[in-house]
């Protein structure tokens, strides 16, 4: 595999590790921070779950809108936009830890939406530019492990991390944001073809 395969996979590890925690802990974090509840059977927890559904929709609307920005970018800017999106995603995840107002969470999920677009487009674009056409199908198939493996690792280590962080779902999202920022830093080490 070309070196870019491995370089991008390092970035992917941090990103998908973080995203696993977004999916796993968002409802509980929102319930704790905004509704001050931790009991999943409570009305507040259900309201938090419903609000997370609205925020998830906002996240994807943000992704679609930001797609128009990315579409106008030059190939030489791919690494910049990749890192930019990951920084925004990291800030969005970290902000959930600090926000206690449901409406302010819209800001967090707009940023996470920008991240969502970049982490689902830029890695594949950077990889396909780095590989020859002869083996591209095989490499792209193998590249999917850089999405699955980090989520498996995140799930396994959560059995130790969650108690270590005081069984705090907001703290797990804070950790996810830090992982996303580490991914943004790792983009610097990708040897992109258009540079």
Which sequence ranges carry the predicted segments?
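A late C-terminal transmembrane helix in Major Facilitator Superfamily
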Residues: 133-165
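C-terminal ends and interior cores of transmembrane alpha-helices
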Residues: 88-100
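Intracellular juxtamembrane helix-capping segments at the cytosolic ends
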Residues: 118-132
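Multi-pass alpha-helical transporter architecture, strongest
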Residues: 174-195
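Helix-to-loop junctions at the C-terminal end of transmembrane segments
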Residues: 65-78, 162
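A membrane-interface helix-boundary motif in multi-pass transporters
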Residues: 160-180
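Loop-to-transmembrane helix entry
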Residues: 36-60
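Pair of pore-lining "gating" transmembrane helices in MFS-fold secondary transporters
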Residues: 5-22, 110
């Amino acid at each position: 595999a070309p070196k870019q395969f491995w370089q991008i996979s390092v970035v992917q590890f941090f990103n998908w590790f973080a995203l696993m925690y977004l999916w796993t802990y968002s409802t509980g974090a929102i319930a704790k921070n905004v509704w001050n509840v931790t009991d999943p059977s409570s009305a507040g927890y259900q309201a938090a779950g419903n609000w997370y559904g609205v925020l998830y929709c906002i996240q994807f609307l943000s992704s679609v809108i930001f797609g128009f920005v990315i579409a106008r970018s030059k190939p030489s800017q791919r690494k910049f936009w990749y890192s930019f999106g990951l920084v925004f995603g990291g800030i969005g995840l970290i902000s959930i830890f600090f926000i206690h107002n449901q409406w302010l969470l819209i800001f967090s999920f707009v940023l996470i939406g920008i991240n969502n677009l970049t982490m689902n487009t830029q890695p594949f674009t950077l990889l396909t530019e780095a590989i020859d056409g002869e083996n591209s199908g095989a490499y792209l198939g193998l590249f999917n492990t850089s999405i699955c493996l980090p989520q498996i690792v995140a799930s396994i280590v959560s059995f130790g991390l969650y108690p270590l962080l005081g069984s705090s779902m907001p703290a797990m999202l804070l950790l996810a944001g830090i992982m996303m920022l580490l991914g943004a830093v790792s983009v610097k080490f990708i040897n992109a073809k258009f540079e």
